[in-house]
Amino acid sequence: MRAIISLLLISAMVFSMIEAVPLEEGLQLFEGERGCLPRNKFCNPSSGPRCCSGLTCKELNIWDSRCLG
């Protein structure tokens, strides 16, 4: 019984810590982890079919992809 109560308390603490990070800050951290470069609007190969700024990616050739608005 003590183990269940302890697990519930730990879960509540972890959830409250996750909620403490604002959504916008979390998105910025995520984009930074992907190595996004929104200034030149190139698609990051590891980011999948999306660009960092939310634009769609058009593949011009194997080595060059650009983001379209």
Curated annotation (Swiss-Prot):
GO terms for cellular component: extracellular region. Residues 21-34 form a propeptide. Disulfide bonds join 36-52, 43-57, 51-67. One of its GO terms (molecular function) is toxin activity. The modification Leucine amide is found at residue 68. The keyword Lyase does not apply. Keywords: Amidation, Disulfide bond, Knottin, Neurotoxin, Secreted, Signal, Toxin. Expressed by the venom gland. It is found in: Secreted. Its main location: secreted. Residues 1-20 form the signal peptide. Belongs to the neurotoxin 01 (U2-agtx) family. Insect active toxin causing rapid but reversible paralysis in crickets. No activity shown in mammals. Does not show effect on mammalian voltage-gated calcium channels. The presence of a 'disulfide through disulfide knot' structurally defines this protein as a knottin. This is U2-agatoxin-Ao1y. It comes from Agelena orientalis.
